[in-house]
A protein has these predicted regions:
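N-terminal TM1-TM2 helical hairpin plus the immediately adjacent luminal interfacial "cap"
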Residues: 52-174, 221-226
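Alpha-helical transmembrane bundle and helix-membrane interface signal
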Residues: 138-145, 185-204, 246-255
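Short, motif-level signal for alpha-helix interfacial/capping segments enriched in acidic residues
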Residues: 41-43, 49, 94-104, 154-156, ...
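Perimembrane helix-loop junctions in membrane proteins
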Residues: 71, 75-82, 192-196, 249, ...
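Specific transmembrane alpha-helix
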Residues: 157-161, 169-192, 232-246
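Conserved, structured regulatory domains from eukaryotic proteins
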Residues: 158, 184-224
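Cytoplasmic-side transmembrane-helix entry/capping segments in multi-pass membrane proteins
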Residues: 148-150, 173-178, 199-205
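C-terminal transmembrane module of polytopic alpha-helical membrane proteins
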Residues: 1-56, 63, 213-300
Length: 300
């Protein structure tokens, strides 16, 4: 997720209720000791059985790539010849901007930023993350609806956090939604750690390292280029929604029933409460209409 400061250069271009022991295979099924003896570490990390075109992950990758191509065509065909910046194009394509949400009630900007990217490198890193993580999560959930909800809800929660804590910039990108998928991963591995063999634990540590590096990237490169609040919000949203998906199976058996209910209702409260609090806070603040200055033509 990037902020408006990146655009000074115009040329810058769930698990559902059916998740019982039979469905709870995902990584463990692909890498159990019986099946993993003849496979290399790479083959266990990228099993061929989960990578195919009939998945939402593949569709999401195609949609994100297609929208970025449309952005480039629109920029070089209309925006640049008429003196409009790349940031103006991103704003018109639905990037998140607080005054548009607070003063003009454009709440679609809580969803559309997930589909918009700043640069090819920005898009490539997110597509690579979906290829590395999304297919696994989708395979484990075995439910298109839960997977799509996990992806979208995480992205929305991330955008709410961005508005709440980084309200002077615009932002966009699927990073928050992807960190939500990582949140599912974290909970899954915690609940299944004692069932994993050595290779499985090595892979899980690799995934955790990627998640950690994704989070600290916002700090290391500075808040002017990466919206760390959206990353953290997406991760928290993914964890909360994953708690809800896991509630009727693993959480119920791993924890005291009262603790499981507390986590379950706390997760619901977080997913419902954060958007409400965010909307109240940004509407109580006097926020200038910065959106009026984003698309001023240099030829004017």
């Amino acid at each position: 997720i990037h902020s408006l400061n990146d655009y000074a250069n115009n040329d810058n271009n769930g698990r559902g209720n059916n998740t019982n022991n039979q469905n709870n295979q995902f990584f463990l099924a692909q890498m159990n000791p019986e099946n993993s003896e003849g496979n290399s570490f790479f083959e266990q990390l990228f099993p061929k059985s989960i990578y195919h075109m009939k998945t939402l992950s593949y569709l999401i990758i195609c949609i994100l790539s297609g929208i970025y191509i449309i952005q480039l065509i629109a920029y070089y065909a209309f925006y640049r010849p008429n003196g409009y910046s790349w940031g103006c194009l991103l704003y018109h394509f639905g990037a998140s901007e607080i005054s548009s949400v607070a003063n003009h009630y454009q709440y679609h900007r809580l969803i559309t930023p997930i589909l918009t990217h700043n640069t090819f490198g920005h898009l490539f890193s997110n597509v690579l993350s979906i290829a590395f993580i999304g297919f696994y999560v989708e395979y484990d959930l075995k439910n298109y609806t839960n997977y799509l909800l996990l992806f979208i809800i995480s992205g929305i929660i991330g955008n709410f956090c961005s508005l709440l804590f980084s309200y002077q910039n615009i932002s966009m990108g699927a990073s928050g939604a992807i960190l939500g998928l990582c949140g599912y991963y974290i909970l899954y591995f915690i609940l299944n750690w004692d069932k994993m063999n050595y290779n499985q634990k090595c892979c899980s540590i690799l995934f955790f390292t990627i998640i950690f590096m994704n989070l600290i990237s916002g700090i290391s490169v500075g808040s002017s280029t990466v919206d760390i609040h959206s990353h953290i919000g997406g991760l928290m949203g993914g964890l909360a929604f994953s708690f809800i998906l896991f509630y009727r199976n693993q959480l119920f058996y791993r924890f005291n029933q009262n603790y499981a209910k507390l986590i379950y209702y706390g997760s619901i409260g977080f997913l419902v409460g954060l958007p409400i609090i965010s909307i109240l806070v940004i509407n109580l603040k006097e926020i200038p209409n910065n959106c009026e200055f984003i698309c001023l033509s240099e030829k004017a």
